[in-house]
């Protein structure tokens, strides 16, 4: 029996989806729950599995549910080098998604500094450089990011253009559109599991030029 296609916002159950920088894996689980399957989802974290279990109370439970849905879970995936990762490099994806990229806890409370902004931009630039090598011909790279100052100074659209990508669309992001998705600080300290408010933010959708 043919399984019907299911959608949640910009994502279809038929898309081959790569999620990077997952914290507690709640966004991955949101998509899997909406689709009723995660057979087409690869969800990755920079952290090791042990680090995740320390940082987030619900990460291990979320990962176990995702595995039952058929999700491919990968740990210690660096967005700066992921296009060379043996477990990912042979794949091509319809959607590559990085939600709320951040260069790390050393910049919490210092987002106004030029050093922080440049470090964040370098993270996004490295992600885009690798992600564009992993796209299907008509695939899209999605970055969800705060649009208020100082986050607006990252210049997401300009960073995409610098990597030879075209901004297809900029769509307002509403957390309520993704049931079960809980944004976490993920700083590596005692506040890793704390929720952070998303405020005004958008999803930037890039394609190959």
Swiss-Prot record:
Name listed for the protein in its UniProt record: Uncharacterized protein At4g26485
Gene3D superfamilies: Vaccinia Virus protein VP39
Organism: Arabidopsis thaliana
Coiled coil: none
Highest taxon in the source lineage: Eukaryota
Molecular functions per Gene Ontology: rRNA (uridine-N3-)-methyltransferase activity
Cross-referenced SUPFAM superfamilies: S-adenosyl-L-methionine-dependent methyltransferases
InterPro entries linked to this entry: BMT5-like (IPR019446), SAM-dependent_MTases_sf (IPR029063)
